[in-house]
Structures are given as C-alpha cells and as structure tokens.
Amino acid sequence: MNSMLNFTHKRKSVSRLLAPVALAVILAGCSSSNQQQASASNITAIATDTSANYLIKAESSDGIESIDWNILALKALIKEGQWTQADNQSKRLSRMSLSPIQMAEWQLARATLRYQQGQLQEALNTLNFQPWWPLPDNQYKRYFMLRAELLGQLGQHSKAARQRTMLDQYLPSNQKNANWQNLWQDLSSYNNSQLQSVSLKEDETVLRGWIQLSILKNTYSQRPVRLKSAVDEWLSMNPYHPAHQYLPTELEAIMSMEVAQLDNVALLLPLTGRFESQGKAVRDGFINAMLDDTSRDTDTELTVFDTEAESMTAIMAKLQANGTQFVIGPLRKEKVTAFQQSNTSQINLLALNQPEQLDVSQTQSCYFSLSPEQEAEQAAQHLFAKGHQYPLVLAPKSKFGQRMTDAFNEQWQQLTGRNADIDTFGSRKQIQQQISRIFGLNDSQARISQMNQLTGVKLESQQRSRRDTDAVYLIANKSELTLLKPFIEVAINPEVKPPKLYASSRGNPNANSDNSELRGIEFSDIPLIINPELSFMERFDSLWPNESNTSIRLHAFGMDAYKMVNELPQLRVVDNYTVQGMTGQLGIDNQCVVQREMDWAVFTSDGITPAAE
C-alpha cells in the first residue's frame, strides 16, 4: 500500500483580503497607528474636519500652508462623497505650485476619487510618483497599494503582483501576510503558459520566486503529494524568500500533510450470514485493487475480520493488540456505530456505510457507501442541468421509495425553490391503473362522460394527460420499468411532447439481459458498467463468471475503498480535489462523506450506450 497521510482539516483558499470599497475609504485619508489628526503640517493624515472648514483655513492662509489646507479639503470632499466639488478642487490644485509631498498627496486623492467613480484606468494614470521625490513611507505604502488594487481589477495581474512586491517594504509586520496572500491570488489568475511569459528583470528575485511557486501549484494541482515534495525542494533552494514566512494558505494546507507509512490495516466485512455475498464481493474488490497496485508497500499487513462471526468488542481488542493503524469497514450501519463506540484508540476509519446521524466528534472517521440517496440527488441535478422544469418522480410505495423521493425532492428544492411532483406505484397488477390516475386519464374520461350525459351529444374528445410534465424519473427495477414505460407512453396525449424518461441503476440489473423494451430510457450507473475497461472485465469474468451488475458494483466499491484509503488525506486538504474511481468521480464533503458522481447511459436495442453530455 502507498505511503499514507494523516488526516487534516480542509483549509479554504483565501479570497482577496482587502475589499475595493474599504481600500478606497482608507486611501481617502490614510490613518497612522495613533489616528493622528490632520494639521497643515501633516497632509498625509486623515481628514477629520469638514471640507468647508478646511477651505476657510485655506483662504485665511498663504503659500505652502494654504496649499496644505486645500489638499485636506480635497480629501474631505472625497470622504463626504461630494464628487463634483472634489473634481473642481482637484483642478484648482493642479494650477498650484506643489512640493513633491503635496504632489504625491494630490495624486493619491485624485486617484481615489476616480477609483470611487469607477474610472479605474484614469485612476491608474493619475498615479505617477517620480523616483527622486523624497516622500514618507506612508505615501509610498498607499501608492503601491492603490496601484496593485487597480491593476488587479483591470486584469493586469502580473503588474499588480509586481506592485505588491514593492509594497512589502512599507508595511508593518501585521499587514505583510495579507499583502502576500493577495499577490498569490493575482498570480492564481494565470495558467503556466501565462506565468512563464511574464517578463522579469534580473533583480526581481522575489516576484520570480512567487511565479515559480505558482507554476508548481498549477503543475501538480491534482497530485498533492508530489506538490508537497516540489514545494519542499523549492523552499530549501530559496532560503531567504518571504514564502518561508508567508506561505500561501492553500500551499500551507498541503505542507501540513504528514506522510506516515501504514504497516497494518484491517478490513471489517460480513463474510458469513445474511450479508455474506455482499461482504465477499467488497473484499474481493479491495484485494483485487491492492494486488493491482504495483507501487504499494509489500510489507503492509492486511487483516480481514468477519463482523458476523465475533463481537465488535472482540474485534477491537484484536485491532488494538495488532497495532492496526487504519480500518476499512464495517459494511452494516449498526456495525459502524458499534465500531465507533468501541474505538477508544482513535483508529482512522473509512466506514463502508453511513449512520443515520453522523457523530461530529468522530473526526478520524470518513464514510463511503453506494448510497441510493446520493444517486437520487444526482438525478435531480442531472435533470436540472438538462433544462427540465417539471419532473415527475415515480417510486415504489415503500420505505426505500420514500427515502429516494425525499432525497430527489430536497435537491430539486435547493435548485429551483419548488417541489417536484412525486407519486408511487404498487404491485405489478396495479401499475396500469395507477399510471392512468397519475397522468389524469381517469379524471379526463370522467369529465368526458359527464359532458355526454349533460348535452346528450357524444363528444369526440380525447382523454387528456398532464401537459406540464417534461421528465419522469423512475425509481424501479427492470421488471417494473418494463411495465411502466409502455403504460406511460400510452397515457401521454400524442399532441403533447412526451416527457423524457430517466431511471436509477436499479433498472439495470444484468449486463447480458435484453433491454430492447427499455430503449430510450436514460439511467445512471457506475463507470465500470457504463464504460467498462475491456481488459479488466475479461479478467473479472474469468475469475467471477456470470456475476450480476449488483455484484459488479460491490466489487467496484471494494476497489474504490482501497483507492480512497490512499486519497482521503489529500481530499480533506485540497479544495475541489476529486479522484476518478470505478464507482464514479469521488470527492468528499465537509463531514468527510464521500460523494460519488455517477455516469449516465441510454438503453438501446443493442444494449447500453453512454449518454451525450
């Protein structure tokens, strides 16, 4: 088995840390740490008085002092939102003879005004400090900060990043991290080709380093372990780069993964009793994937326990005595709960089922199952993505059917704010009558008969079915589908566009069965069934001949359980990280419940074919 990683909580990437509006307010009058009040000798401080008072002071003074008061009046007008008056005041100042500090403050104020007016390019053009100006750090700080923000919003992210490298020297230590995180966000807008084309001067070593790190991140975005190694190597070769102290949050999460070699893992499954066949199929899939893994550590010890043959207390005692580091299973919900209650040693767990209520204190536990509820939720997402607006869900009148329809409807409500139409069917004998009722044929026939009696004239009216339904999601096995499909087709008014029929994987029980009666129905299933790897399936059929699709799904489930043991820590750390498995595209939610995105196919006269996206 490959090197394993300890679990860590998923870290969210940092969004831009300084909102434009907040920045504009700051730049209208940059505060010092002691909130120094503006005076004629300190035009760089906050304008705390009204513009009217500043203008009065300007009129009553001369020379440099008068200009100072006029600059403070401009800053106050911007702060007050008096943009027309601020424009006029800015023009007045442009005709005055300004010192470098006054010129810099005027540029900053005028750029802030254009920024707040939404004139980003004009604001940027305004900022043009000259290198020979002897200016205080306060002004340089605001100059580079505003230029970086403007360039970023104008889509010139590499130039924005360059401004942030120059800004760093003017920032106090408690503001440096936010600046470097914003620089990282600027570079994250680029792919590797764009990053490699950025023109750099020889002395821009800091910016070059950030670009190199960003290229590594892009290159290994789906290979977190390799990314960790590459960043480690880069840091060792660049010991003085600020990334050592201010590593971007997403890279920090990667670096927090601790590689730990697992020597001892256990598989807990029902290998006797009622669930024997399911347990053995999962076991065979797990071991199959393990043997196929050429990069695994051959010294890893795997122990398989039969959860039906001994108590969980006895199994737990053996796990602790053996020094087991990771458990896969159990398969039954009640056994999962029993394991967690006995797990005083905090052994990492990938449960192969999900209890009704997740225990949030079980931070070392993740959950993976072939959840029919997840399949129903995905069906709602799939129908919504296909543009359907009024789906009807038909399910068996049972607890299982209720769970499936509830899952579909909850997802549909989240997507549309509306409930889906839901109905049930019973025994095979009742299906035709129930379909007629569901699609309104019985009511329609009754209305026609009533009109005939009232008028005494035979009406040539056709029975009308519901017109709004544009899709039907059928939660049914194959025999039920075989009955439902023709009855629905008969019930639909021929003048109305028939609803598209969809089904769950329950309707696809056997790879070799005749599905011609189901042609046209689109259904969800695992990739191994919809897009099988021929070489793998040939080997599978030779080892386990004539297996049903149910057994194939369980075998694939076992294979993916093995894959997830290696991938879980990366899934927990890297946002939007997914893995292609035999049962679907695999990711996790914030409770470490594995989410499966299944494939879709269509029944045809010749079998099944992948559905068009």
UniProtKB/Swiss-Prot annotation:
Keywords: Cell outer membrane, Cell shape, Lipoprotein, Membrane, Palmitate, Peptidoglycan synthesis, Signal. Pfam families: LppC (PF04348). Residues 1-29 form the signal peptide. One of its GO terms (biological process) is regulation of cell shape. GO terms for molecular function: enzyme regulator activity. GO terms for cellular component: periplasmic side of cell outer membrane. Coiled coil: none annotated. It is a lipid-anchor. It is found in: Cell outer membrane. A lipid is attached at C30 (N-palmitoyl cysteine). A lipid is attached at C30 (S-diacylglycerol cysteine). InterPro entries: LpoA (IPR007443), Peripla_BP_I (IPR028082), TPR-like_helical_dom_sf (IPR011990). Belongs to the LpoA family. Interacts with PBP1a. Regulator of peptidoglycan synthesis that is essential for the function of penicillin-binding protein 1A (PBP1a). This is Penicillin-binding protein activator LpoA. It comes from Photobacterium profundum (strain SS9).
